């Protein structure tokens, strides 16, 4: 081979390696955006848990008092006669009756896979939910699973409303049976659009094959989480005249879902993980039925909340493994812990287990080993963040408990038609849109901080100052230098035009995405039970009204134990503002109305800020070739999703050799 040919080969090799490195850097950057945003969002929601925890810890007299809202919500919901009414629109003519058998499963799959007209009659929805709750109630907290008869078992992770992935699993692996048992490891709903169908199908599978389907509870089997992440809105939109009754049945299902499973007494299957204080013996003895919501504590007559058992449930639902030693609070999620390999070894030794299968985290390949293969993460929702963002997977374990992984991507035909560049463009656009929506929550603060570094009002600041502001304000821990060209397009290599960043946040595609989302305040007001629980805790004398003295007592306790976390003066002023009729007391209606008005004012202020900015400061010209306009158009086009009937055969899958993985 002559010298020129060798040089050409080396040049091509260098170019290819640089290209591959750039692709991998882009993939990792997008993944970090998705994951950090997901954890930051859950951290917001976990603040509600923290608030309850602080109140109960420092107001122990409240923990033994009955929460009237919760107490009345669960007394007889399974025994009452259905008071369901007819729904408007198309209701499919599919009859479900007890006992549920395989023919009913086939009927449900055929109904649900259709893009349109996939609503069951509400009486059949109630039938499935009621019977499932009654049956689940009889199960232990930790379900024993055995391969003695079947010689194998399949474990699925998070599905998050991805009905297409569930149908792919059933198509590839077969329906449950005595020779083909399944464990579904929580997080059936939220985020995806077909959460109700996923939940109903899983519960129907359980009713049809009770000895071959095991359902574990995840952290999203919780009405507080559902209020934030879309499932409650999904049920309301599909059954607008019966959603309250259906959601009450769903709460009953949640409270009786088992907390985990143990396979052949050697493998623990739980949704999140564990901490250094987790005890399976204690978990087995907990009355799980009182934990309708993990994020909202149960308050019952004369029975103070046991924080130890509450923490046990919280840790197995919310925790994640870490590479470093020790057990520390999970600051990314704001709940649960990070547990290291030493914690895993100790936990397995104490409980005589071989390894643990958990879910709770999206992984690029659908699964991941950690802690010397003693922790296996399985995630079954493919295309979770965006089309092509990740593969889903499930595990098949044989009688020797050797795991075999099956990877898949649902709706494969949609990605086959796309080039790699197009797939990466879709993932990147989805990541940027989610990030921009999150940034809009801090838009005013971003603008104020940018201007501090621009005293001459030139519209430009240094790259380091731009990155510093982005991190200090959002606290997302992202590689901002890599994102600068995306979030401030069209700027030079030395300075950043921060107005480009602000203009991007005001584009139609970002405003529409923000409107489709739900804030913590939205979720809190939508889930009035949380507000009622807070009200009842502060109402020390159980009079049905909060006096200024009672409010001040609660504030004093919080301020004393958490200095700097709360401003007493500001909170007292907020209490006075809640007193709408000026009688010196705040009743429940005033308490709820104050939250509604506060959220309404917040939204009106956002609209006013947009109008003010459009006229109050010089904006970058919006032309067809303007960088911000081009980026917004790219995001809008690349995040367009067309719905089709679900075809479970439309998938790509392969079996992974566990030795190679």
UniProtKB/Swiss-Prot annotation:
Which residues hold Ca(2+) 1? 539, 541, 543, 545, 550
* Domain IQ intervals: 7-32
**From what superkingdom does this record's organism come?**
Eukaryota
Give a GO molecular function annotation for the protein.
manganese ion binding
* Residues that, per the record, bind Mn(2+) 1: 158, 160, 187
- What SUPFAM superfamilies does the record point to? EF-hand (SSF47473), Metallo-dependent phosphatases (SSF56300)
Has the keyword Calcium been applied to this entry? yes
InterPro entries named in the record: Calcineurin-like_PHP_ApaH, EF-hand-dom_pair, EF_Hand_1_Ca_BS, EF_hand_dom, IQ_motif_EF-hand-BS, Metallo-depent_PP-like, PPP_phosphatase, Ser/Thr-Pase_EF-hand_contain
Question: Which stretches does the entry tag as region Catalytic?
Answer: 105-413
- Coiled-coil stretches are none
State the organism named in the record. Answer: Drosophila melanogaster
UniProt binding sites for Mn(2+) 2: 187, 219, 271, 360
Q: Where is the active site?
A: 220
Region of interest (Disordered), residue spans:
606-625
Query: Where in the body, by tissue, does this protein show up?
Result: Expressed in the visual system of the fly, as well as in the mushroom bodies of the central brain.
| Reaction(s) catalysed (UniProt annotation) | O-phospho-L-seryl-[protein] + H2O = L-seryl-[protein] + phosphate; O-phospho-L-threonyl-[protein] + H2O = L-threonyl-[protein] + phosphate
Provide the top EC class: hydrolase
Instruction: Give its E.C. classification number.
Output: 3.1.3.16
Q: What is this protein called?
A: Serine/threonine-protein phosphatase rdgC
A GO BP entry is: visual perception
Give TM regions: none
Q: How is the cofactor bound?
A: Binds 2 manganese ions per subunit.
Q: Which GO terms of the cellular component aspect does the record hold?
A: cytoplasm; cytosol; nucleus
Residue numbers binding Ca(2+) 2: 579, 581, 583, 585, 590
For activity, the cofactor(s) needed are: Mn(2+)
């Amino acid at each position: 081979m002559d010298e020129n040919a060798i040089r050409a080969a080396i040049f091509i090799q260098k170019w290819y390696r640089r290209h591959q490195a750039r692709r991998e850097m882009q993939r990792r950057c997008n993944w970090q955006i998705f994951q950090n945003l997901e954890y930051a969002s859950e951290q917001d929601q976990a603040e509600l848990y923290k608030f309850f925890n602080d109140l109960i810890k420092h107001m122990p007299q409240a923990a033994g008092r009955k929460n009237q809202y919760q107490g009345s919500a669960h007394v007889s919901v399974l025994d009452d006669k259905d008071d369901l009414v007819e729904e408007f629109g198309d209701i499919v003519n599919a009859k479900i009756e007890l006992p549920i058998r395989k023919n009913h499963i086939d009927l449900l799959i055929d109904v649900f896979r259709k893009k349109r007209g996939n609503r069951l009659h509400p009486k059949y929805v109630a039938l499935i939910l009621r019977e499932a709750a009654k049956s689940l109630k009889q199960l232990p907290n930790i379900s024993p699973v055995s391969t003695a008869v079947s010689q194998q078992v399949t474990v699925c992770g998070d599905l998050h409303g991805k009905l297409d992935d569930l149908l792919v699993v059933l198509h590839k692996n077969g329906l449950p049976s005595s020779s083909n048992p399944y464990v579904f490891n929580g997080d059936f709903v939220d985020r995806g659009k077909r959460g109700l169908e996923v939940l109903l199908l899983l519960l129907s599978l359980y009713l049809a094959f009770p000895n071959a389907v095991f359902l574990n509870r995840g952290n999203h089997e919780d009405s507080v989480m559902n209020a934030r992440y879309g499932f409650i809105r999904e049920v309301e939109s599909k059954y607008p005249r019966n959603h309250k009754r259906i959601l009450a049945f769903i709460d009953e299902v949640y409270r009786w879902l088992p907390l985990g499973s143990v396979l052949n007494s050697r493998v623990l299957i739980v949704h999140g993980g564990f901490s250094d204080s987790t005890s399976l013996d204690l978990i087995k003895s907990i009355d799980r039925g009182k934990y309708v919501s993990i994020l909202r504590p149960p308050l019952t007559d004369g029975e103070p909340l046991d924080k130890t058992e509450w923490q046990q449930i919280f840790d197995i639902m919310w925790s994640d493994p870490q590479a470093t030693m020790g057990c520390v609070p999970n600051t990314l999620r704001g709940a649960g812990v990070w547990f290291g390999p030493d914690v895993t070894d100790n936990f397995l030794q104490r409980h005589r287990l071989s390894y643990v299968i958990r879910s709770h985290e999206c992984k690029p390949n659908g699964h991941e080993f950690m802690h010397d293969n003693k922790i296996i993460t399985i995630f079954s929702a493919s295309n979770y963040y965006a089309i092509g963002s990740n593969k889903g997977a499930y595990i098949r374990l044989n009688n020797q408990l050797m795991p075999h992984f099956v990877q898949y991507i649902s709706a494969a035909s949609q990605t086959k038609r796309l080039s790699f560049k197009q797939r990466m463009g879709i993932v990147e656009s989805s990541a940027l849109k989610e990030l921009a929506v999150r940034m809009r929550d801090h838009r005013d603060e971003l603008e104020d901080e940018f201007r501090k570094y621009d005293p001459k009002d030139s519209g430009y600041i240094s790259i380091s100052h731009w990155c510093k502001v982005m991190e200090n304000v959002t606290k997302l821990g992202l590689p901002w230098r890599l994102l600068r060209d995306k979030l401030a397009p069209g700027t030079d290599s030395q300075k950043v035009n921060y107005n480009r960043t602000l203009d991007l946040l005001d584009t139609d595609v970002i405003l529409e995405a923000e409107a489709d989302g739900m804030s913590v305040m939205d979720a809190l007001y939508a889930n009035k039970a949380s507000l009622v629980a807070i009200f009842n805790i502060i109402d020390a004398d159980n009079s049905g009204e909060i006096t200024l003295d009672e409010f001040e007592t609660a504030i004093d306790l919080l301020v004393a134990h958490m200095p700097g976390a709360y401003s007493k003066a500001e909170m007292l002023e907020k209490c006075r503002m809640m007193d709408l009729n000026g009688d010196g007391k705040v009743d429940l209606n005033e308490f709820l109305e104050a939250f509604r008005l506060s959220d309404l004012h917040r939204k009106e202020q956002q609209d006013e800020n947009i109008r003010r900015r459009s006229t109050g400061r010089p904006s970058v010209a919006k032309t067809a070739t303007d960088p911000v306009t081009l980026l917004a158009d790219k995001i809008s086009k690349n995040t367009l999703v067309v719905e089709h009937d679900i075809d479970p055969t439309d998938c790509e899958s392969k079996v992974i050799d566990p030795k190679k993985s």
